[in-house]
């Protein structure tokens, strides 16, 4: 069966064409059924392809005269969407010339372009940015939203949970992902009205969906591996994500400094090197690269701007997996299963929840 192409914004990211093309070539070795649409400066892409014969015959170049800069405002980037590599990659998905787009460019611009060009799925009010985070368990943690929406009501959080669960079923091979809401405590009385209303709604909907809703979790428990999907608003999620990244860098720097402090420490490093290399691999963001904009009529994946070729390859591999497993159609099916209106309502945070409506009907 012919699989849709993956459009790669070859000009995005800190390292530009060389790393993006090399990353696509590495991913091609793992997913050799996929072909690529490389979008950007044609001459520079052709030059980069000379070192990757496995990709040359499996890709087409779409010349784009402009790029989106890292500090460009989304409104400005939108006006140039028809001529930039990022905008043209997303529009290729819109036109059906590619099944998904991958970019390491400006996150705000990518979000704005993707939302405008692809629109949200029926039953989804806002797309969410989701990523895989390392844990002590067997699987990575799916966490969303990580910055696309700074404020969310209960309705948004429930929609995020449904999308995150669909994502976790694919990337971690789970039948019924364990879903929790990020909160300042695990007690049912803790948190905002939006969080408590979302919890009530998810309890009511869990039976109709292949997920297990486990209530609330706290930020210090995200890495334990006892939950598969954590849902939050983009403001809290972005802070939690960057705190985890900062903690990982702190541990790595502390180990490096400790092992170089004396001759005995250096000898200790040599003895413990296998363990420290394993730790380094586990904490390396390149091994968990590829944040997905969930809730759109198409797949858009954001690679870290400073990702290595291996990191880009992992982002492309995530994209390929989501295309193979029909993520968008799975989310649509889950939304249809519960009914769009069932998750477009919420209690105190804006409307009546399914459970609240039932109580009122009973009282009447």
From Swiss-Prot:
One of its GO terms (molecular function) is phosphate:acyl-[acyl carrier protein] acyltransferase activity. Keywords: Cytoplasm, Lipid biosynthesis, Lipid metabolism, Phospholipid biosynthesis, Phospholipid metabolism, Transferase. Pfam families: FA_synthesis. The keyword Aminoacyl-tRNA synthetase does not apply. Pathway: Lipid metabolism; phospholipid metabolism. InterPro entries: FA_synthesis, Phospholipid_synth_PlsX-like. It is an enzyme of class 2 (transferase). It comes from the Bacteria. One of its GO terms (biological process) is phospholipid biosynthetic process. It catalyses: a fatty acyl-[ACP] + phosphate = an acyl phosphate + holo-[ACP]. Belongs to the PlsX family. HAMAP family: PlsX (MF_00019). This is Phosphate acyltransferase. The lineage of its organism: Bacteria, Pseudomonadati, Pseudomonadota, Alphaproteobacteria, Sphingomonadales.
């Amino acid at each position: 069966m012919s699989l849709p192409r993956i459009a790669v914004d070859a000009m995005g990211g800190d390292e530009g064409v060389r790393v993006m093309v090399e990353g696509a070539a590495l991913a091609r070795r793992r997913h050799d059924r996929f072909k690529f649409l490389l979008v950007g400066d044609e001459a520079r892409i052709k030059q980069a392809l000379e070192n990757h014969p496995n990709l040359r015959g499996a890709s087409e170049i779409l010349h784009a005269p402009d790029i989106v800069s890292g500090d460009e405002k989304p409104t400005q980037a939108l006006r140039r969407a028809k001529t930039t590599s990022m905008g043209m990659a997303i529009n290729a998905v819109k036109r059906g010339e590619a099944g998904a787009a991958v970019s390491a460019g400006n996150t705000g611009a990518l979000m704005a372009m993707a939302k405008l060009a692809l629109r949200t799925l029926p039953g989804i009010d806002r797309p969410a940015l989701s990523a895989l985070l390392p844990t002590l368990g067997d699987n990575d943690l799916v966490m969303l939203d990580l910055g696309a929406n700074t404020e969310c009501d209960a309705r948004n959080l429930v929609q995020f949970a449904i999308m995150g669960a669909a994502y976790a079923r694919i990337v971690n091979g789970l039948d019924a992902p364990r879903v929790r809401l990020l909160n300042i405590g695990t007690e049912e009385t803790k948190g905002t009205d939006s969080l408590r209303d979302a919890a009530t709604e998810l309890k009511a909907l869990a039976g109709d969906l292949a997920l297990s809703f486990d209530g609330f979790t706290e930020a210090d428990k995200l890495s334990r591996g006892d939950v598969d999907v954590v849902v939050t608003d983009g403001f809290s999620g972005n802070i939690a994500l960057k705190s985890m990244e900062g903690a990982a860098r702190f541990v790595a720097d502390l180990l490096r400094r400790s092992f170089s402090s004396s001759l005995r420490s250096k000898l200790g490093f040599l003895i413990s090197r296998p363990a420290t290399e394993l730790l380094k691999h586990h904490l390396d963001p390149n091994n968990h690269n590829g944040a997905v904009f969930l809730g759109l009529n198409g797949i858009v994946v954001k690679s870290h701007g400073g990702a290595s070729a291996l990191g880009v390859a992992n982002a492309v591999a995530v994209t390929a997996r989501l295309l193979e497993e029909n993520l968008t159609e799975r989310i649509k099916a889950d939304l249809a299963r519960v009914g769009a209106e069932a998750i477009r309502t919420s209690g105190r945070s804006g409307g009546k929840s399914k459970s609240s409506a039932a109580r009122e009907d009973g009282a009447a």
